[in-house]
Amino acid sequence: MQIFVKTLTGKTITLEVEPSDTIENVKAKIQDKEGIPPDQQRLIFAGKQLEDGRTLSDYNIQKESTLHLVLRLRGGMQIFVKTLTGKTITLEVEPSDTIENVKAKIQDKEGIPPDQQRLIFAGKQLEDGRTLSDYNIQKESTLHLVLRLRGGMQIFVKTLTGKTITLEVEPSDTIENVKAKIQDKEGIPPDQQRLIFAGKQLEDGRTLSDYNIQKESTLHLVLRLRGGC
């Protein structure tokens, strides 16, 4: 059958393959056509990086499927992933790796399914389809891994005008995450938000569970006046 391989330069290569061909075989065919050594090739299909020992049929790659070829930067880089238990995992990655790829590597090392992983860097939750370089994650950067509790929960946020906003959250969400969700719904920048629960102002770096905020709790939103303290 024929498949297509699209490079980052936009060039498309046509290959004659069999469903039983391994990814390694495919890389050899690409080398024959383009002169790129297999160890510098990374093949992506449906957002997944393909492993050398697996076959096209393992990945359900059928005739006229398009694979994406990304060149592996020599050497790649190491990053660290710190879990809530304090354990630090070291990963070999490339700047062009997607967050989804990184979660797959964490699954390989730790057995945690990607859909239960949330990765945080510089206070931001990282989105699956974006790459490390999109977030300016460089060698020896540290990401934080938070486990997503299945199902999450609803909380309410009441504004001074009396309006109540409903949010879908997880106990492990930081206050910063909650402010980002409020910004998404209401357009209020996080730096203008102050959140109050049980008479306490909530700090950005802490989580809902730190403050014992449970399902259907109500937070109060006070707007911070520009230039105020």
Swiss-Prot record:
Residues 1-76, 77-152, 153-228 form the Ubiquitin-like domain. It comes from Homo sapiens. GO terms for biological process: energy homeostasis; fat pad development; female gonad development; female meiosis I; hypothalamus gonadotrophin-releasing hormone neuron development; male meiosis I; mitochondrion transport along microtubule; modification-dependent protein catabolic process. The keyword Ubl conjugation applies. The record marks 54, 72 as: Interacts with activating enzyme. The modification (Microbial infection) ADP-ribosylthreonine is found at residue 66. Changing residue 48 to R: No effect on HLTF-mediated polyubiquitination of PCNA. There is a cross-link at residue 76 (Glycyl lysine isopeptide (Gly-Lys) (interchain with K-? in acceptor proteins)). Keywords: ADP-ribosylation, Cytoplasm, Isopeptide bond, Membrane, Mitochondrion, Mitochondrion outer membrane, Nucleus, Phosphoprotein, Repeat, Ubl conjugation. The gene is UBB. The modification Phosphoserine is found at residue 65. This is Polyubiquitin-B. Changing residue 76 to A: Loss of ADP-ribosylation. Pfam families: ubiquitin. Changing residue 63 to R: Abolishes HLTF-mediated polyubiquitination of PCNA. Interacts with SKP1-KMD2A and SKP1-KMD2B complexes. GO terms for cellular component: cytoplasm; cytosol; endocytic vesicle membrane; endoplasmic reticulum membrane; endosome membrane; extracellular exosome; extracellular space; mitochondrial outer membrane. Belongs to the ubiquitin family. Ubiquitin is encoded by 4 different genes. UBA52 and RPS27A genes code for a single copy of ubiquitin fused to the ribosomal proteins eL40 and eS31, respectively. UBB and UBC genes code for a polyubiquitin precursor with exact head to tail repeats, the number of repeats differ between species and strains. Residues 229 form a propeptide.
